[in-house]
């Protein structure tokens, strides 16, 4: 993914307008763990940017004709991941959108490649304690149907964080008003896309996207 500068006609525009112009037809993709707030923040971010919001999990359920827990139970996780990759590819091909991805979507190489090509990615980074508090009462998380959900969450974070960290922008997901986090997303997008500032790990090349070799 490449840092952008806005055209002179964008000077004086609101940050939201400038970000959409700098996206130049690309989508925004929110990545991160279950319970990080990707759908909640994504809807509000899309409204602020006047872009269409799409929840990948909802689209997967629509395409499969069954809820995600049933897909896992009936067909297994590999089958689910295959369908997830196809749905995300279709959605990104039809962009620009604000896309909330599933927690494990970026585990697939082809999905990481598609996100790097067609989207600017935002990692909503949440601590294990925050995630557990948000999801512990929900029965629609098949990967948490274990004897020790807290240990499962910590294991998944450890496995996935090296990939999440490759996102273009990182925003801490914590228990503050949603609009604060949306404001941070827009501010960081504006700095990265419109002012050419690096907003992720300072050691990382700003032209890099998701590593598709992992």
UniProtKB/Swiss-Prot annotation:
One example of a Gene Ontology biological process annotation: aromatic amino acid family biosynthetic process
Catalytic reactions of this protein: shikimate + ATP = 3-phosphoshikimate + ADP + H(+)
EC numbers for this chain: 2.7.1.71
Pfam families given in the database record: SKI (PF01202)
Pathway the protein takes part in: Metabolic intermediate biosynthesis; chorismate biosynthesis; chorismate from D-erythrose 4-phosphate and phosphoenolpyruvate: step 5/7
Binding site for ATP: 35-40, 141
ATP-binding listed as a keyword: yes
Keywords, in A-Z order: Amino-acid biosynthesis, Aromatic amino acid biosynthesis, ATP-binding, Cytoplasm, Kinase, Magnesium, Metal-binding, Nucleotide-binding, Transferase
NCBIfam families: PRK13946.1
Family the UniProt entry places it in: Belongs to the shikimate kinase family.
Subunit structure: Monomer.
Annotated protein name in UniProt: Shikimate kinase
Lineage: Bacteria, Pseudomonadati, Pseudomonadota, Alphaproteobacteria, Hyphomicrobiales
Gene: aroK
